[in-house]
């Protein structure tokens, strides 16, 4: 269990509780979780973070009524800056989006502006929102993470409790390499409900070579770990930076959707540009 799982800041969340579904607009449904909850135990300070990045959300179940009452549907793309005070709790996000269902808006841009305003207020940070008509995305190919997949190793694993022990002495040699490693075996659990979260992760770095077996064992150790998606990515970035000390590092995870939403956080200390094309499990 994470050290802050019972923090009072989490007590008021609707997550893990029975809730009513409202279908008329209600911005108060949105709930934020302070990023400091997981950053403080990691020694990360808001004014001196070792990374930049965003939390990329895809909204697959977004619908509202136009001015004449005709339902509209869209796919939304949201990017929340890493400097925001709060991350956005996903169940509250789903409930908030449901409140658009029977609400009339004059045009698409009004919907976009409403989302941008409310999400920014909840997160207390910079956010961007784009809405796409379905025909704009038809034929969009399934993407993949560029890099070398480390999953097909002939190793025995019998411990699934989170530990950084695998990263100790996990670099080999003095030669500086630049490579991108990928795993589809990332599985963690919701901080509150402990429901499984399934993801693929891309790790791009420049530095002494990281032992792939030790890295895979470390990633698999998240299997019983309870944290939100964004928190897991920041923990992985911080652990790799601390133990492996790469000159450059980027960590990007794309998680499978739940409740019509997928969350795809990335953190980097270089000029990393994430691909936003959905992966095969998304």
Curated annotation (Swiss-Prot):
One of its GO terms (molecular function) is preQ1 synthase activity. The active site is at 190 (thioimide intermediate), 197 (proton donor). It is found in: Cytoplasm. It catalyses: 7-aminomethyl-7-carbaguanine + 2 NADP(+) = 7-cyano-7-deazaguanine + 2 NADPH + 3 H(+). SUPFAM superfamilies: Tetrahydrobiopterin biosynthesis enzymes-like. NADPH binds at residues 90-91, 258-259. Its EC number is 1.7.1.13. Substrate binds at residues 88-90, 229-230. GO terms for cellular component: cytoplasm. Pfam families: QueF, QueF_N. Gene3D superfamilies: 3.30.1130.10. Keywords: Cytoplasm, NADP, Oxidoreductase, Queuosine biosynthesis. Belongs to the GTP cyclohydrolase I family. QueF type 2 subfamily. Homodimer. Catalyzes the NADPH-dependent reduction of 7-cyano-7-deazaguanine (preQ0) to 7-aminomethyl-7-deazaguanine (preQ1). This is NADPH-dependent 7-cyano-7-deazaguanine reductase. It comes from Shigella boydii serotype 18 (strain CDC 3083-94 / BS512). The lineage of its organism: Bacteria, Pseudomonadati, Pseudomonadota, Gammaproteobacteria, Enterobacterales. The gene is queF.
């Amino acid at each position: 269990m994470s050290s802050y799982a019972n923090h009072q800041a989490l007590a008021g969340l609707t997550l893990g509780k029975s809730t009513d579904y409202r279908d008329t607009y209600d911005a108060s449904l949105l709930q934020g979780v302070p990023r400091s909850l997981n950053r403080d135990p990691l020694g990360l300070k808001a004014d001196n973070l070792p990374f930049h990045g965003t939390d990329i959300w895809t909204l697959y179940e977004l619908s509202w009524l136009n001015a004449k009452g005709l339902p509209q549907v869209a796919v939304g793309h949201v990017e929340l800056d890493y400097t925001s005070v709060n991350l956005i709790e996903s169940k509250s996000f789903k409930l908030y989006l449901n409140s658009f269902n029977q609400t009339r808006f004059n045009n698409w841009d009004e919907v976009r502006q409403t989302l941008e305003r409310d999400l920014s207020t909840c997160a207390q940070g910079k956010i961007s929102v784009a809405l796409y008509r379905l025909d704009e995305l038809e034929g969009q190919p399934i993407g993949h993470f560029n890099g070398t997949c480390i999953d097909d190793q002939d190793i025995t694993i019998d411990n699934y409790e989170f530990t950084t022990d695998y990263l100790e002495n996990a670099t080999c040699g003095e030669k500086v390499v630049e490579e991108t490693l990928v795993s589809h075996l990332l599985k963690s659990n919701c901080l509150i409900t402990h429901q499984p979260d399934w993801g693929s992760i891309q790790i791009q770095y420049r530095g002494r070579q990281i032992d792939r077996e030790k890295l895979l064992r470390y990633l698999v150790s998240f299997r019983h770990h309870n944290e939100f998606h964004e928190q897991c990515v920041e923990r992985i970035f911080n652990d790799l930076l601390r133990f492996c000390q790469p000159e450059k590092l980027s960590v990007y995870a794309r998680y499978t959707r739940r409740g019509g939403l997928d969350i795809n956080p990335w953190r980097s200390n270089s000029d990393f540009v994430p691909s936003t094309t959905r992966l095969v499990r998304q």
